[in-house]
Amino acid sequence: MQTKPINQLDFVDSELTSFVSHLETTYLDQNKGAFIVTANPEIGFEAMQNPRYEAVLSSADFILPDGIGVVMVSKLIGKPLQSRIAGYDLFTSLLDKADQKKKRVFFYGAAKHVIAETIERVKRDFPGIEIAGYSDGYVKDQREVADKIAASTPDMVFVALGYPNQEFFIHKYRHLFPQAVAVGLGGSFDVFSGNVKRAPSFFIRFHLEWMYRLLTNPARWRRMLSIPKYVTAVLKHERASAKPHYTGQVKDQSRHL
């Protein structure tokens, strides 16, 4: 799977259908695990500020450009990515695959009523999925949840704890369920369960989901600042990387008489 670097992270350069097909043939059909990060500008900016988090993201098998801000900055630095791959779209696409292939899936994250409603919808709309287990995101002992996941032998693990917690969790415990495709999904359970409304198709088609979220929840304006902050930080990093570095060696071209 082709990737392109933005700052220190290698982003998948593909589109949703091709990526899911690659996951299906190379991982799901082979019972091979993978760690997938769905990185929006907030995650990208946090990684630039936090070396430990950056290292965790870099350990993932795939980093997806989940956010038009990531795609936009890729074009500005001359490394254009083909498409945004939204975490929610990946989630529903993988549910389709799990339904078709009778896969075992574990769901972890969100509030108790949200995870309960998520499981209820999965049972209704994806009857072929075998629910390996689930847990809300407020269990204090994460190792307890990790052991529960391991014991359930899932084919897929969806973790919706929000960044950076979901990535730290998968990175720390994926060795307990090495056969599973594990994905960090942010607030996807909230949308899937109907507790949060996703942007109408018009906003999605024109890459304006951020505007819809801001219009419907003005309190998010501080989070929206991550987009220009990320773009500015990446451009600054690219300019610094492009500058020639003085090696300390100067060739003596003087004429000796």
UniProtKB/Swiss-Prot annotation:
Superkingdom assignment: Bacteria
Q: Which UniProt keywords apply?
A: Cell wall biogenesis/degradation, Glycosyltransferase, Teichoic acid biosynthesis, Transferase
Q: Which reaction does it catalyse?
A: UDP-N-acetyl-alpha-D-mannosamine + N-acetyl-alpha-D-glucosaminyl-di-trans,octa-cis-undecaprenyl diphosphate = N-acetyl-beta-D-mannosaminyl-(1->4)-N-acetyl-alpha-D-glucosaminyl di-trans,octa-cis-undecaprenyl diphosphate + UDP + H(+)
Q: Which CDD domains match?
A: Glyco_transf_WecG_TagA (cd06533)
A Pfam family of this chain: Glyco_tran_WecG
What GO biological process terms are annotated to this protein in UniProt?
cell wall organization; teichoic acid biosynthetic process
GO MF annotations for this entry? N-acetylglucosaminyldiphosphoundecaprenol N-acetyl-beta-D-mannosaminyltransferase activity
Q: In which pathway does it act?
A: Cell wall biogenesis; poly(ribitol phosphate) teichoic acid biosynthesis
* Keyword Transferase (UniProt): yes
EC code: 2.4.1.187
Give the family, as the similarity comment puts it.
Belongs to the glycosyltransferase 26 family. TagA/TarA subfamily.
Give the protein's biological function: Catalyzes the conversion of GlcNAc-PP-undecaprenol into ManNAc-GlcNAc-PP-undecaprenol, the first committed lipid intermediate in the de novo synthesis of teichoic acid.
Task: Please identify the protein, giving its name as recorded.
Answer: N-acetylglucosaminyldiphosphoundecaprenol N-acetyl-beta-D-mannosaminyltransferase
User: What species is this protein from?
Assistant: Bacillus spizizenii (strain ATCC 23059 / NRRL B-14472 / W23)
Name of the gene: tarA
